[in-house]
Amino acid sequence: MEIEKTNRMNTLFEFYATLLTDKQMNYIELYYADDYSLAEIAEEFNISRQAVYDNIKRTEKVLESYEEKLHLFSNYVVRNQLLEELMKKYPSDQYLISKLQEIQQIDEEEF
Protein backbone atom coordinates (compact mmCIF):
# COMPACT_ATOMS: atom_id res chain seq x y z
CA MET A 1 0.00 0.00 0.00
CA GLU A 2 1.33 3.41 -0.92
CA ILE A 3 2.25 5.56 2.06
CA GLU A 4 0.94 8.74 0.41
CA LYS A 5 -2.43 7.16 -0.29
CA THR A 6 -2.61 5.74 3.22
CA ASN A 7 -1.84 9.13 4.74
CA ARG A 8 -4.38 10.85 2.50
CA MET A 9 -7.13 8.34 3.32
CA ASN A 10 -6.38 8.59 7.05
CA THR A 11 -6.57 12.38 6.84
CA LEU A 12 -9.77 12.41 4.79
CA PHE A 13 -11.20 9.90 7.26
CA GLU A 14 -10.42 12.30 10.13
CA PHE A 15 -12.29 15.08 8.37
CA TYR A 16 -15.27 13.14 7.03
CA ALA A 17 -15.69 10.04 9.22
CA THR A 18 -18.96 11.26 10.68
CA LEU A 19 -20.47 11.34 7.19
CA LEU A 20 -19.78 7.64 6.63
CA THR A 21 -21.88 4.66 7.64
CA ASP A 22 -20.72 2.54 10.57
CA LYS A 23 -19.64 -0.22 8.20
CA GLN A 24 -17.66 2.19 6.03
CA MET A 25 -15.99 3.67 9.10
CA ASN A 26 -15.07 0.24 10.47
CA TYR A 27 -13.57 -1.06 7.23
CA ILE A 28 -11.60 2.10 6.43
CA GLU A 29 -10.30 2.44 9.96
CA LEU A 30 -9.22 -1.19 10.15
CA TYR A 31 -7.64 -1.13 6.69
CA TYR A 32 -5.86 2.21 6.76
CA ALA A 33 -5.38 3.16 10.41
CA ASP A 34 -4.94 -0.28 11.95
CA ASP A 35 -3.24 -1.85 8.90
CA TYR A 36 -5.49 -4.91 8.73
CA SER A 37 -5.41 -6.96 5.55
CA LEU A 38 -8.53 -7.51 3.47
CA ALA A 39 -8.57 -11.13 4.66
CA GLU A 40 -8.38 -10.09 8.33
CA ILE A 41 -11.28 -7.67 7.92
CA ALA A 42 -13.30 -10.29 6.02
CA GLU A 43 -12.73 -12.80 8.80
CA GLU A 44 -13.62 -10.24 11.49
CA PHE A 45 -16.98 -9.48 9.83
CA ASN A 46 -17.60 -12.94 8.39
CA ILE A 47 -17.84 -11.73 4.79
CA SER A 48 -15.83 -12.30 1.63
CA ARG A 49 -12.53 -10.60 0.95
CA GLN A 50 -14.04 -9.24 -2.27
CA ALA A 51 -16.91 -7.62 -0.35
CA VAL A 52 -14.40 -5.86 1.90
CA TYR A 53 -12.35 -4.73 -1.10
CA ASP A 54 -15.44 -3.38 -2.89
CA ASN A 55 -16.62 -1.52 0.20
CA ILE A 56 -13.20 0.06 0.79
CA LYS A 57 -12.91 1.16 -2.85
CA ARG A 58 -16.41 2.70 -2.77
CA THR A 59 -15.64 4.44 0.52
CA GLU A 60 -12.39 5.85 -0.87
CA LYS A 61 -14.41 7.38 -3.71
CA VAL A 62 -16.94 8.74 -1.23
CA LEU A 63 -14.19 10.38 0.85
CA GLU A 64 -12.62 11.93 -2.26
CA SER A 65 -16.05 13.13 -3.35
CA TYR A 66 -16.64 14.81 0.00
CA GLU A 67 -13.28 16.56 -0.29
CA GLU A 68 -14.05 17.70 -3.86
CA LYS A 69 -17.30 19.26 -2.68
CA LEU A 70 -16.43 20.54 0.80
CA HIS A 71 -12.66 21.20 0.62
CA LEU A 72 -12.23 20.83 4.38
CA PHE A 73 -8.80 19.23 4.12
CA SER A 74 -7.40 21.46 1.38
CA ASN A 75 -8.69 24.60 3.11
CA TYR A 76 -7.16 23.40 6.38
CA VAL A 77 -3.76 22.99 4.69
CA VAL A 78 -3.91 26.42 3.04
CA ARG A 79 -5.08 28.08 6.25
CA ASN A 80 -2.19 26.56 8.20
CA GLN A 81 0.32 27.65 5.56
CA LEU A 82 -1.00 31.20 5.69
CA LEU A 83 -0.86 31.26 9.48
CA GLU A 84 2.74 30.03 9.42
CA GLU A 85 3.69 32.68 6.85
CA LEU A 86 2.17 35.43 8.99
CA MET A 87 3.99 34.19 12.09
CA LYS A 88 7.30 34.21 10.24
CA LYS A 89 6.71 37.62 8.68
CA TYR A 90 5.70 39.33 11.94
CA PRO A 91 7.54 37.45 14.71
CA SER A 92 7.83 40.52 16.94
CA ASP A 93 4.10 41.34 16.91
CA GLN A 94 3.08 39.43 20.02
CA TYR A 95 -0.59 40.33 19.75
CA LEU A 96 -0.77 39.04 16.18
CA ILE A 97 1.18 35.90 17.06
CA SER A 98 -1.14 35.12 19.97
CA LYS A 99 -4.24 35.55 17.78
CA LEU A 100 -2.75 33.37 15.05
CA GLN A 101 -1.97 30.70 17.64
CA GLU A 102 -5.56 30.87 18.86
CA ILE A 103 -6.76 30.26 15.32
CA GLN A 104 -4.41 27.28 15.00
CA GLN A 105 -5.63 25.91 18.30
CA ILE A 106 -9.25 26.15 17.17
CA ASP A 107 -8.38 24.30 13.97
CA GLU A 108 -6.62 21.55 15.91
CA GLU A 109 -9.56 21.12 18.29
CA GLU A 110 -11.99 20.76 15.40
CA PHE A 111 -9.98 18.00 13.78
Swiss-Prot record:
InterPro entries: RNA_pol_sigma_r3/r4-like (IPR013324), UPF0122 (IPR007394), UPF0122_fam_protein (IPR054831), WH-like_DNA-bd_sf (IPR036388). Signal peptide: none annotated. Pfam families: UPF0122. HAMAP family: UPF0122. NCBIfam families: PRK00118.1-1, PRK00118.1-4, PRK00118.1-6, YlxM. Belongs to the UPF0122 family. Might take part in the signal recognition particle (SRP) pathway. This is inferred from the conservation of its genetic proximity to ftsY/ffh. May be a regulatory protein. This is UPF0122 protein llmg_1069. It comes from Lactococcus lactis subsp. cremoris (strain MG1363).
